[in-house]
Amino acid sequence: MKTLSIKRNNDFLRIYRRGKTVADSRVICYVSPNRLGKIRLGLTTSKKIGNAVARNRARRVLRAAFREVYPMIKPGFDIILVARTKTTFTKSTALTPILTAQLGKLGALQSTKEV
């Protein structure tokens, strides 16, 4: 299933204002429920990260880590991932458990209870 993107500035601002937040040294995660019943992802990389090459690498790493966590996320959430300077030097395999923990704290993951 393809992830929908958050593209409008209004959507980003709404999630920043009303969403829940968890921060780590590598990534900041904002989560807010939406009425679409679908998962939407927004990525933010500021110029503090470095030049265009570093920012694009940070985005690729975040996307790859999110792809691994995606099947565990409940539908109906908007998620914004903000890259930090350490994101550029982190592999997506190291970022996946961090994202899983953050989304779990924010209540965006499906329960793993098996009957």
Language-model-detected regions and their locations in the chain:
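Positively charged, solvent-exposed patches that mediate nucleic-acid binding
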Residues: 1-115
